[in-house]
Each structure stands twice: as structure tokens, then as C-alpha cells.
Amino acid sequence: MNDKTYCSSAFLMYRTIPDHSKQFQEGVSPKFFVPFSEPPTQVHDSFDLEDSLKKSVERACKKGKTAIALSGGIDSAILAKFMPKGSVAYTFKCVVPGIEVTDETIQAAKYAKECGLEHRIVEIYWEDFERYIPILIEHKGAPCHSIEVEIYKAGLQAVKDGHDTIIYGESSDIHYGGLSGLLSKDWTVGEFIDRYSYVKPYHALKEYQLVTEPITKYEENGWVNVHEFNRHELFVEAMGSYTNACETAGINVECPYARTWLADPIDLNRVRAGENKYIVRELFNRLYPGYVAPPKTPMPRPVDQWFKDWEGPKRPEFWPHCTKYMNGDQRYYVWVLEKFLDYLDTQK
């Protein structure tokens, strides 16, 4: 069904189109993550998790043409332990001239050395966004997450280097309680809609819908079951970013954590006491004795710097000056939505 208002509003709120029966316009069909055909491995403890992750990595590496994306965090560091010696590990490094931004390459290099991997840096520039966003949104049939540019560029480099598969640590946070902010308290429905929405659509769009069903279906006696929301709704959105970027680059993607499932109820008391991803951390500490797990950081992308001077959207669907008080992430979502609407005009 064609519904530009719904799709625009839903993207700003959730970074995806939750109702997969809807599209922006006739002839441009969004691509979504297709669930795996086999059921996920049930994980009760860190030993179950280790066994499943190791098998997934070994399976992906059988052909000898597999690389890994290695950040400074613990999720990909764990996977690196299972890679064959001499494998290539890519780390993203965003570059903003004259400004120091988050740099994970130093910590990632330590993991690479520990695991006997060849460490390579993929530098990301603003010009990559201008160059690759049109390609990514055309392939996706929808606006895309900002991380897709980095994933796509790494995929292109990996293909150039002779690889056919790249491994990511995606979905560990979703399945094992890494999203501490979302799990920090019990949320009422209205509270969580406000908390989760990336951009409230009425802040940007003249015609909008409040898309609440992705959250209200996880309501239990007035409270939102956030863990279930994360590992269903957020999981599909997040995995869709990796599959779209890698498909567009012409490389297979493997996300071993995505093939697992926390079998027992998540211990929210431990998460809220500062012990997020307690099963994953236990595994990291076992594989890297003596290492101190670094603070969790999102995939680096200095959108605050890149969008600091952006004047906002010019299309008639948007309110003038709507991005004036938005942060960099919010400005990016409005910017890429406008880019996608421009693309749709060429497809009529």
C-alpha cells in the first residue's frame, strides 16, 4: 500500500517502516531483513554463547575468504578470538578535518594483535555520505541508517581485498541487555514512545502520523516489555542496515550474535546495577584475562560535526527551520529522508 505520510513518520520515529505492507510510492518497494530459516541457538550462560559464536565464525570462515569488522568494543573482540590467525580485521575511523572524534582503532589494534589478525583501517569522510547515500537508499527502497555508509565502504574494501564475507558483532546489545538506557527503568507506553522516537514526526513534517503500534503491541498492564521490543522490532531494523549495506557492496554478512537467543528472562536488576550484557562480559573476561572492558560506544559517526551548519530541509513536506534545535543524529534522519523523497521524484 502506498502511504508516504505513514512511511515518512515511521522512519523518523523508528528508522524503519514497521508495517512491511506499506511503501512510500508505487514502484519503489522497501527491502527488509529476512529472518533466518533456522531457529536461533538457545543461550543460558556464557558457555552456551561461546559455543554458538565459535561455530558460527568457523562456519563462515570455511572458505578462507572471510574478514571481520573489529571495533574497540567487546562484542567483536570476542568474535576475533575465533578467527583464523592471519585473517583481516577492518576498523572504521571517521575523519573530520581539524576536529578530534571518537577513535576506536587504538583499542581494536590491541585485540587484533592479541588474536594474530592483520589490522586495516577504513577511513570514513563526509564525502562518503554524499557519494554512497544515493546508492544505498536506491537499493533499500527507503531512507537508511547512517551506519550503512560505513558498513558499505568496508564491504567495498573487503571485496577489493578478495573477501566474500564479513563478520560483525551486531545484535549482542539487543539480545543480551546492552541497551542500558532503554532498559534503565520500567516505562509506561507514553513514556517509552517519547523516549524511543528518534524524531517526533510533528517536529519535522507538516503531514504526519504517530506510529505507536510497534511499541503498544509489547504493552503488559500499561508497561512496555522493552527487552521483547528490542529483540523483535529493533532487531529487524538493525539487521536490515547490515544486510542492505553488504548486499549493495556485493559481500555476504555474518552476524553470529543474531543467531542466538537469550533463553532465560533477562536480569534487569543486574543491567540496572551497571552490569549490562552480563553474559557477554563474562565471556569476554574469560577470553581476555587481564583486559579491562572499554566503555560501550556506538559505531563512530560524527554527525554533530557534519550537520552543525546544515540549514535544514527545503522540501514542502517539512516545516521551515524544523532542525534548528535538533542534535546531529536527528538532523541526519531528516536529511536522509529529504534525500529519499528527492529520489522518489525521479521515479514517478
Pin down the residues of each PLM region.
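Phosphate/ATP-binding catalytic cores across multiple sugar-kinase/actin-like superfamilies
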Residues: S46-I68, Q157-H163, A238, D342-Y343, ...
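RNA-binding accessory domains that recognize and position tRNA/RNA substrates
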Residues: M1-K65
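Acidic, carboxylate-rich catalytic segments that either coordinate divalent cations
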Residues: N2-C7, M13, T165, W319-K348
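Mid-to-C-terminal catalytic subdomains of enzymes
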Residues: S171-V189, E228-K324
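Hydrophobic transmembrane helix bundles of membrane-integrated enzymes that assemble
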Residues: E26-E38, V43-S46, S52, A77-F82, ...
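Short, flexible loop segments at boundaries between secondary-structure elements
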Residues: W187-I215
